Amino acid sequence: MKKFLAPFFVFFLFIISCIILPLPSHAAVTPDTSEIRDGIRFSECVRPYDGGVLIANYGSQHKMPGIDEIKGYILYQKNGQTKTLIPPGVLQYPSGIAVKDDYLFVCDGEHLRVYQLQHPEKAPQTITFPKPYWLKAAAVDGNTLYVSSDNVGQIFTLDITHPENMSRVQPKKWLELQGVKCMAVGDGVMYITALPENGPDVDETKVENIIFCVRDLKHPKAETFFSRKMYSGDPAADKNISVYYEGITLSEDNYALYITDHRVKTGAILVLDIGTREMRVIYEEEGLDPSDLTQTEKALFIPDMKNHRVLKLEL
C-alpha cells in the first residue's frame, strides 16, 4: 500500500506548490526615481554634455512674444552638483537646446543662440529667424542642425560644419508639419511629435496622437510611424485622455523611443519599440508636466516644467 501512496503524495505536493507559490509577475517594473531641483525654474529641455546634463530654464512663467523678460539661463548638473553655466542677461525664451562638440545651440524665441561651452561667458553668436517663426526644439545629426517652429509648423536645417563661425549660415526650410513639437534623429531617420489635429470641424472621437517619421533626410516627407486614438470609448479611461505628445528621444541603442505624454490629470513617460511599434507606459504621475527629455548614462532626464524640477528615471 505504501508503494502506491508515495507517488500519489509526491504528485499531491506538486499540485499544492503550483497553487501556493507565486507566479511570475508580468506587471511593468516602476523605475527608480530621483529629482534635481537646485536652481531650476520653468525648465523645458535637458541635453547631455560631458558626463552631466544641461538644463534650459525660462526663469519666469512668461514665454510669449511681447513679454520681454530676459530671465532665461542654462544650468549644468554633474555628479550631484549644479552650477549656472549661462546666467540671465541674454536669453529670453530658451526652449529647445542641442549640443555638438563644445557648442550649445539654444532656441530662444525668434533667435538661435550659439554658445562656446568652454567659454560660456562670451557673447553668443545669434541667427535671427524671420517673423513670425517662433523656435521650439533642436536636434543635431552630424553637421546638420534641425530646428522646429511650432507656431507655424516648420522644420529648418542649418549647416553646423563650422559652429565657431555661423555668421553666414542661413536657415533653410526643410519640412512643413502642422503643430510640430520635438524631434529625435538616429540611423538616418527622424522621429517627430506634433499636436493632434483640432478645430471646429474635427470629430474628437476620431482624433489621433501621432508619432511621425522621415525616412529620407535628403528628401523629407512626413509619414505616420505610430498612431493612437485620443478617445478609447471607455468612459473611465477617457477621463484621463492623452492630450498630446511632446518630448521625444532615442534610446542609446536606437531600438526604442521615449516620449513625454501630457494627459488630462497626469503626465506620463512612454516607451515605443521601433521594431514592433508597441507602446507602453513606464512612468506616470499626477500633475507631472513633462517636456523635452533626454537619455544618458542609462537614465532618462525629464524636465517637469510647472513643478520646477528635472525628474530622473533609472532604466
Segments predicted by a language model, with ranges:
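Bacterial N-terminal signal peptides
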Residues: 9-20
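Hydrophobic alpha-helical segments and helix pairs
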Residues: 114-159
